[in-house]
């Protein structure tokens, strides 16, 4: 997901997506440990998406404090 798409979402929607991505990341790591994961790049992609979403939430918090 791109930052532009994330910025169009509300903070609550972003937090829901973060929760879903964290669950997916947990499952991907589990698959990696058991040798079932085929697309290892997906782990990195999910981590980056979570980081993007957290960054945008933080930007909104800082903007609200000014």
From Swiss-Prot:
GO biological process: one example: translation
InterPro entries: Ribosomal_protein_uL29 (IPR050063), Ribosomal_uL29 (IPR001854), Ribosomal_uL29_CS (IPR018254), Ribosomal_uL29_sf (IPR036049)
A molecular function GO annotation: structural constituent of ribosome
Paired cysteines (S-S): none
Keyword field contains Cytoplasm: no
Gene3D superfamilies in UniProt: 1.10.287.310
Pfam families the UniProt entry points to: Ribosomal_L29
Keywords: Ribonucleoprotein, Ribosomal protein
Highest taxon of source: Bacteria
One GO location term (cellular component): cytosolic large ribosomal subunit
UniProt cross-references to NCBIfam families, sorted A to Z: L29 (TIGR00012)
Sequence similarity: Belongs to the universal ribosomal protein uL29 family.
Protein name in UniProt: Large ribosomal subunit protein uL29
The species this protein was found in: Geobacillus stearothermophilus (Bacillus stearothermophilus)
């Amino acid at each position: 997901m791109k930052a532009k798409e994330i910025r169009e979402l509300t903070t609550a929607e972003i937090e829901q997506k973060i929760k879903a991505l964290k669950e997916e990341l947990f499952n991907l790591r589990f698959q990696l440990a058991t040798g079932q994961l085929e697309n290892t790049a997906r782990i990195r992609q999910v981590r980056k998406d979570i980081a993007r979403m957290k960054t945008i939430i933080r930007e909104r918090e800082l903007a609200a404090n000014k």
